[in-house]
Swiss-Prot record:
PANTHER family in UniProt: 12S RRNA N4-METHYLCYTIDINE METHYLTRANSFERASE (PTHR11265:SF0), S-ADENOSYL-METHYLTRANSFERASE MRAW (PTHR11265)
Protein name: Ribosomal RNA small subunit methyltransferase H
GO biological processes: rRNA base methylation
Lineage, highest ranks first: Bacteria, Bacillati, Bacillota, Bacilli, Lactobacillales
Binding residue positions for S-adenosyl-L-methionine: 35-37, 55, 84, 105, 112
Organism: Streptococcus pyogenes serotype M6 (strain ATCC BAA-946 / MGAS10394)
Family of this protein: Belongs to the methyltransferase superfamily. RsmH family.
Amino acid sequence: MTKEFHHVTVLLHETVDMLDIKPDGIYVDATLGGSGHSAYLLSKLGEEGHLYCFDQDQKAIDNAQVTLKSYIDKGQVTFIKDNFRHLKARLTALGVDEIDGILYDLGVSSPQLDERERGFSYKQDAPLDMRMDRQSLLTAYEVVNTYPFNDLVKIFFKYGEDKFSKQIARKIEQARAIKPIETTTELAELIKAAKPAKELKKKGHPAKQIFQAIRIEVNDELGAADESIQEAMELLALDGRISVITFHSLEDRLTKQLFKEASTVDVPKGLPLIPEDMKPKFELVSRKPILPSHSELAANKRAHSAKLRVAKKIRK
C-alpha cells in the first residue's frame, strides 16, 4: 500500500473467508478502496482464478496497481474505473455473465476521509466537495447552496436521521442568503449553531449525521448500492456468495431487506408444497450480522459501526 493511500481494511478475513473461495473462481471486489480485501482474496486464488475490481476513484486504482503488481503480472486482476451501479453492464462487456462471489465495503474509504481537499470530513477545513468520483458534477457545495429548504430537510432527515433537520436547514438558508457557504468548517459551525446546547454535550460530533446525509445525496450511495447488489445477486453462479459490509443503519437496512426478500417466500397459508419457481433463490449464511472482534475494534476505531451480512445462491 502506498504511503499516500493508507487504509486499514475492516473485517478482512471474515468478509473474504465467507465467500468460500474456489481457486479457479471468478470474483468481484465492488469497492477496491485500499485493496486490502482484494489482496487477501487474490492470495486464495489459483492461476485460473480472476478478480475484477471496481472503484470510481482513480487514486485507489493507482494504489492497487502498485500493491497488487505480482497478481497483475500474472494476469489475474482487471480494474474497472466506474461506479459499481454499472456492475452488470461493465462485466458483460468483458464477457463475464456469471461470478462465483462478490464483496462490498460500503461507505467512504479512510484515504478519502483523510484527504483534506475531498471535503468529506467535518474535522478539517476544506472546500465543500464530497464527490467519490472527482469527475461527477454534483458537489456538496451545490447541495448546500442551491437546494430549496424543503429538499434540505428531506435529505437531512432521510439520510442523516437528524431530528433537528428543519432547524439546520433554516440556519443554512439564512446564512447562504448573505453569502455562499464554501467550506466544511463553515457548514459544521452552522450545524452546531442550529442545535440546542444540550445536544452539543452528547457524544460524537454534532455535524456527523448531516455530513453523512449530504455525502449520500452527492454520490447517490443508497441508490447505487440498491441497484448494484441486485445485479450482483443476478450474476452469482449456483453456490455463489455475496458479502456486504455496511457502516450505518441505512446501508444495513437496505442490505438486510434485499437479502430477506431473496431468502424468503411469501406463500398462502396451507399450501402443501411450494412450487419450484416460487422457492427462494438465496439463503443467509449468517442469520445475524457479523461484527468486528474486540481486537479489531481496539486496533481500528473506524471499525466500530461495521456490520457484515452474507448470502448464498441456492437456486438459479
